[in-house]
């Protein structure tokens, strides 16, 4: 997989609409974080989960485990996962929760864009549960720079033939680079299958600039650098020498 980032040509109205969508995304993200934090607090007070976790950790600490202990470890892992799911702490649970919350923003964000944000929150939950994460944090509006996608058939859809991004009523024109070398590289990069399209924003002194981040299957093509030095050619009878 590789990405191609193209600047979007936006009008004042389109910039306003995109900003509304980032506001909606920020709201949904923090709603999901609040819900996940409540679920994690309930899990911390679950005595059954604490007992299972203690037994599981005791087995993990052993350098060598018997077949019975390995079987018990798998059984405990399933029971722990069931406890987390019961408290609403699973990827699918968060996706379902935010899907319901996201219905009020159905004209601003697609179902898969809402789902992608739930997945981001779940990544934070995983760090708290299984990694070195200490707490799930709320985010400020300025912290959001990407509205994610999952397929090119839902949400922000990139049209290669027209070089437009069609997104729930918005048709956003993509700028192509002017230099011949960069332009040929972009076209070469877009030859693979378009997986999905993200909407990104970057802050400049003049304000936000918006980009289409197109995710393409396959490896990125090799960029060929064109030199600027002077080269002399000395043609011979059967060979040509370059200096």
List each language-model region with its residue ranges.
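Nucleic-acid substrate recognition interfaces
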Residues: 1-243
């Amino acid at each position: 997989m590789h990405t191609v980032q193209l600047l979007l040509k936006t009008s004042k109205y389109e910039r306003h609409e995109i900003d509304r969508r980032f506001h909606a995304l920020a709201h949904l993200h923090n709603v999901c974080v609040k819900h996940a934090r409540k679920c994690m607090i309930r899990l911390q007070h679950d005595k059954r989960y604490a007992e299972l976790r203690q037994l599981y950790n005791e087995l993990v600490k052993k350098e060598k485990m018997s077949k019975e202990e390995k079987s018990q470890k798998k059984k405990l892992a399933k029971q722990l996962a069931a406890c987390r799911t019961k408290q609403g702490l699973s990827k699918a649970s968060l996706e379902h929760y935010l899907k319901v919350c996201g219905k009020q923003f159905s004209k601003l964000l697609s179902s898969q864009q809402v789902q992608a944000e739930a997945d981001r929150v779940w990544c934070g939950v995983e760090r708290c549960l299984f990694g070195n994460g200490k707490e799930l944090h709320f985010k400020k509006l300025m912290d959001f720079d990407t509205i994610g996608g999952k397929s090119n058939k839902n949400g922000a859809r990139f049209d290669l033939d027209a070089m437009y991004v069609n997104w729930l009523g918005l048709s956003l024109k993509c700028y192509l680079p002017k230099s011949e070398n960069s332009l040929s590289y972009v076209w070469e990069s877009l030859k693979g299958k378009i997986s999905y399209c993200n909407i990104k924003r970057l802050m400049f002194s003049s304000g936000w600039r918006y980009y289409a981040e197109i995710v393409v299957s396959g490896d990125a093509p090799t960029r060929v650098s064109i030199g600027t030095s002077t080269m002399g050619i000395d043609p011979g009878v059967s060979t040509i020498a370059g200096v």
